[in-house]
């Protein structure tokens, strides 16, 4: 499903089917992308695990590759150069033909202009009797009909005259490969060998004028102010091409290029020209780890440098990164197949074949559509078989293995309906004529190739496919090791920052609880190699604060005292306590303080320092460190930060300052067809079919709702586009290459943006590379604006302000009545997260008194099925209050420890509940834990 709106089967289903059939391997080759690799790998890992549990070994290999869009940038502007200067003689010619194939189609007109010393000196023009009727489409295009060529000379009569006209001259044509292939083919049939220098004005124009949007003859004539009188008439096209060529000769002299040899030396295509080349399909397989990296380099280049409707890969780049790669000739859209259909010369075909490591043929049904094409000489299935026979002959002649492949786009024959729907949605008129691009069995493939003879059929279906498989090592699509970024002295840096800040807050002698908690955290963080993550977050937050914007810490990072002391979060996770800002008196353990265990220190009553008389600070939110880094402190921290949406882009840019240019990438995402979109595709398809039937007097197509839903289900999750995580930044350690992990690209292939994302969905590589969550949020922006408007520092606003808390119960503090604001009873309408009907109903049900109540309400509002029919009911029945109900996962661990349960057991219960293991009945320890909770007086409603 990762071939863009083309493939419709999950890679996991294809792999499982191949294994059931006893196949030894399967190659994953999506169009232009490699985004199915990680799913394929995870499928294999799961299957190998399942086999291992049964004491069996799964002998199956994934071959990782791509069906690339290959462009040939290796063609030289001048073929067979012999040092001719541009003052020599040139014959600029053009042909009109009955079709595109030099092998079977005929020449109907030859037009030529001789150029010497940059001046037109002679002309040659003649019709040619093709001895067959001129197809109607050719007559429409050229306005040449059978009457006009009836009495013209035949090709065997006129071609020698034309070649005599060209003798000693360099031949020039627009898209010379087409015209010269006809000349060479027809000359060979009458025993004449054509060995001349040839210049292609398309390639020459691409070199001299790389920024044109295309290089059609009429485009060039307009650009160079050349007259083109009757386009698609040989004599007029040749004259126009000659005028263009003369102007381009002057441009060559201006560049100090006086002859054809120097033209070939200088005339290399730039990126713009390469992007405009016609693409061919080509299979590229990675045979080993080096090949995988080189494959990713090619995929990245195709998306970043050469994308033009398709991610194109130049041949020269393939040659540069060829180590570890196996190159196949692909399908009917491949370069070799096209050259055979178009009747290219033997020399050209030999050049093409020699580029590939193996050649491909496919079932006749795959290419049956060619029989219906007016512009293709293929008339029947035997013509298609002959093309495959020719490829087999070329394989034998050049020593290239020929492999029979089935070009799988869907798993089973009946699955074509999904692709039909998708193709129709893209506007293809022939969507209903689906080729049999399903996964074939070995027997089916042998039957498809039986016209080759049983021995040769077995060779291409079995022997050679296994030969390719044996050339490929078992590899993983992503380097398996963890590669965190490195910041020099990050361990000591974090320790110093935290200890200095702790002393600033708690005084020269730290309370024992602070020392023990901080030391435990720092030891866990540093010993597990996580200090760099804290330092990165610290640098980003401090930079934002210095620039005037607060940063909100999301989620469980607030449970880390090290994060508090590093300035990453203002949330203090210690148990509630009093602290004197002047003399550092503290109170963690008085009965008055213990009463607020599991709550928030800011909810405690105001108090004066018994030592110096200063007002005590009320601190601590009682969040266990285990919720962040696990019970043993070895869980990887997930530091999510909310930056101002106005500042987010600057924070992203600052990561490049921290790590260096080219070391950070936006986290990539893959957009697929959603359920409703798929349903819309199916509905539209059948509506349009019914409308067409109505015009043709046929009955409408009626599909039951369940059938529409079934078909829509098969269209879900097909790749549609790519994008970027709103705040995710992937960090590559210095000294590493991104292609060890993933290719890269622009989001949605937008070539106008400088943003570069990972090609793989970021979830596929988040175990290998660090992803920073630098999110944009409105709240820090609003706080900054309010600070500017009022002059009040938001960090100095007391969290126990009675007036502020009253907003969650009535409107009196605002100086207005409910009837003034449409009957709204609360003053929370403008407070983020609390202004919805659902949230305000929660407020009215729970009647929050304290700041900790608001935290609990936020937990209930964002959980799944924890309020409606759950906590709400318990509160209404009087079994619980907002203070005693389970509102966050931390509540479970803290409460169970308070009830006397072992801390590790309390942690495990919390995690099993959080992960849904208890609710789904998948927690085998639950009966034992439940009894333990009962024994410790935990009420039934809580359990």
Model segments located where?
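Substrate-recognition/cap helix-loop segment adjacent to the acidic, metal-dependent catalytic center
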Residues: 180-197, 338, 342, 347-349, ...
């Amino acid at each position: 499903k990762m071939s863009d709106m083309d493939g419709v089967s999950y890679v996991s289903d294809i792999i499982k089917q191949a294994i059931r059939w006893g196949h030894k391997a399967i190659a994953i080759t999506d169009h232009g992308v490699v985004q199915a690799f990680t799913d394929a790998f995870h499928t294999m890992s799961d299957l190998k695990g399942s086999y291992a549990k049964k004491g069996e070994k799964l002998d199956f290999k994934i071959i990782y590759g791509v069906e690339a869009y290959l462009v040939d940038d290796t063609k030289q502007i001048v073929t067979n150069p012999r040092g001719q200067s541009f003052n020599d003689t040139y014959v600029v010619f053009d042909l009109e033909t009955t079709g595109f194939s030099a092998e079977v189609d005929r020449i109907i007109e030859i037009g030529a202009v001789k150029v010497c010393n940059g001046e037109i000196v002679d002309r040659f023009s003649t019709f040619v009797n093709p001895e067959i009727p001129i197809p109607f489409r050719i007559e429409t295009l050229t306005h040449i009909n059978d009457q006009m060529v009836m009495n013209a000379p035949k090709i065997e009569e006129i071609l020698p005259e034309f070649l005599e006209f060209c003798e000693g001259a360099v031949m020039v044509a627009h898209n010379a490969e087409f015209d010269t292939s006809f000349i060479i083919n027809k000359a060979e049939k009458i025993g004449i060998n054509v060995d001349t220098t040839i210049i292609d004005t398309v390639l020459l124009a691409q070199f001299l004028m790389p920024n044109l949007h295309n290089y059609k003859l009429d485009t060039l004539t307009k650009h160079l102010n050349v007259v083109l009188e009757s386009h698609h008439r040989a004599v007029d096209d040749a004259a126009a091409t000659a005028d263009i060529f003369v102007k381009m000769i002057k441009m060559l002299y201006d560049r100090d290029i006086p002859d054809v040899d120097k033209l070939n030396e200088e005339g290399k295509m730039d990126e713009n020209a390469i992007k405009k080349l016609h693409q061919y399909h080509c299979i590229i397989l990675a045979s080993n780890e080096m090949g995988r990296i080189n494959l990713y380099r090619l995929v990245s280049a195709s998306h970043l440098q050469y994308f033009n409707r398709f991610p194109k890969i130049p041949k020269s780049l393939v040659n540069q990164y060829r180590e570890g790669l196996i190159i196949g000739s692909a399908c009917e859209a491949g370069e070799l197949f096209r050259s055979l259909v178009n009747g290219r010369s033997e020399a050209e075909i030999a050049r093409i074949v020699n580029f590939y490591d193996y050649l491909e043929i496919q079932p006749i049904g795959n290419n049956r559509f060619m029989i219906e094409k007016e512009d293709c000489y293929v008339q029947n299935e035997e013509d298609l078989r002959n093309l495959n026979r020719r490829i087999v002959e070329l394989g034998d002649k050049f020593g290239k293995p020929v492999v029979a492949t089935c070009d799988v786009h869907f798993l089973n024959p009946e699955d074509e309906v999904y692709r039909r729907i998708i193709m129709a949605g893209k506007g293809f008129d022939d969507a209903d004529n689906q080729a049999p691009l399903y996964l074939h069995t070995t027997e089916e493939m042998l039957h498809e190739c039986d016209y080759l003879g049983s021995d040769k059929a077995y060779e291409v279906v079995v022997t050679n496919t296994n030969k390719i498989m044996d050339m490929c090592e078992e590899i993983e699509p992503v380097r398996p090791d963890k590669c965190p970024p490195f910041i020099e002295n990050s361990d000591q840096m974090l320790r110093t920052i935290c200890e200095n800040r702790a002393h600033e807050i708690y005084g020269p002698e730290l309370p024992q609880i602070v020392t023990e908690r901080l030391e435990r955290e720092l030891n866990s963080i540093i010993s597990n190699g996580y200090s760099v993550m804290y330092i990165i977050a610290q640098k980003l937050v401090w930079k934002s604060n210095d620039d005037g914007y607060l940063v909100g810490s999301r989620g469980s990072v607030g449970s880390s005292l090290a994060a508090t002391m590093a300035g990453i979060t203002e949330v203090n996770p210690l148990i509630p306590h009093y602290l004197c800002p002047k003399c550092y008196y503290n109170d963690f353990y008085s009965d008055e303080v213990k009463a607020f265990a599991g709550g928030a220190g800011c909810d405690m009553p105001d108090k004066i320092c018994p030592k110096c008389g200063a007002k005590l600070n009320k601190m601590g939110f009682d969040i266990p460190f285990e919720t962040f880094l696990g019970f043993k402190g070895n869980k990887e921290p997930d530091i999510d930060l909310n930056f101002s949406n106005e500042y987010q882009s600057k924070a992203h840019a600052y990561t490049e300052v921290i790590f260096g240019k080219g070391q950070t990438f936006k986290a990539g995402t893959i957009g697929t067809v959603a359920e409703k979109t798929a349903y819309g595709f199916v509905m539209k398809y059948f509506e349009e079919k019914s409308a067409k039937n109505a015009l043709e007097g046929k009955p409408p197509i009626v599909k039951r709702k369940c059938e529409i839903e079934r078909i829509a289900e098969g269209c879900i999750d097909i790749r549609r586009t790519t994008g970027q995580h709103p705040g995710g930044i992937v960090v590559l350690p210095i000294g590493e290459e991104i292609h060890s992990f993933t290719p890269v690209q622009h989001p949605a292939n937008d070539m106008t943006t400088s943003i570069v994302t990972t090609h793989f969905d970021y979830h596929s590589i988040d175990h290998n590379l660090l992803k920073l969550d630098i999110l944009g949020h409105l709240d820090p922006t609003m706080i900054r604006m309010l600070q500017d408007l009022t002059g009040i520092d938001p960090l100095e606003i007391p969290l126990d302000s009675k007036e502020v808390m009253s907003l969650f119960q009535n409107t009196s503090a605002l100086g207005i009545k409910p009837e003034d604001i449409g009957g709204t009873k609360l003053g929370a309408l403008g407070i983020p997260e609390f202004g919805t009907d659902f949230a305000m109903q929660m407020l009215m049900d729970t009647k929050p008194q304290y700041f900790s109540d608001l935290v609990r309400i936020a937990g209930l509002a964002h959980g799944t099925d924890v309020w409606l029919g759950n906590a709400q009911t318990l509160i209404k029945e009087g079994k619980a209050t907002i203070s005693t109900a389970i509102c966050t996962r931390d509540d479970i661990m803290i409460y169970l420890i308070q009830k006397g349960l072992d801390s590790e057991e309390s942690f495990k219960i919390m995690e099993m509940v959080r992960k849904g293991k208890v609710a789904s009945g998948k927690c085998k320890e639950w009966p034992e834990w439940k009894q333990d909770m009962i024994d410790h007086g935990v009420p039934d409603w809580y359990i």
